[in-house]
Swiss-Prot record:
Listed name of the protein: U6-lycotoxin-Ls1d
Posttranslational modification: Contains 4 disulfide bonds.
Leader sequence segment: 1-21
Cellular-component GO terms for this entry: extracellular region
Organism: Lycosa singoriensis (Wolf spider)
Propiece residues: 22-25
GO molecular function: toxin activity
Keywords: Disulfide bond, Secreted, Signal, Toxin
Pfam families: Toxin_35
Subcellular location(s) per record: Secreted
Highest taxon in the source lineage: Eukaryota
Family to which the UniProt record says this protein belongs: Belongs to the neurotoxin 19 (CSTX) family. 06 (U6-Lctx) subfamily.
Amino acid sequence: MKLLFFTALVLVVISLIEVEAENERACIPLEKECTKTPGNCCSGLKCDCYRRFEQGVAKGIQCWCIEKDVTYKGV
């Protein structure tokens, strides 16, 4: 009975470690595009979106993972 309990506990711990590792791999790093998956930026980052214009014509929206609490201004 103790062996069965111990085996089940080990399997649960291994499963949790694998899930956590998978979640870490799935995040999008700093300054990478997050247009299709805005909620997947790594921790400490947010997905910030901008409307892109070419010669005054809107060409769609692009989003990038940037640092939280950082504001960028045009030059």
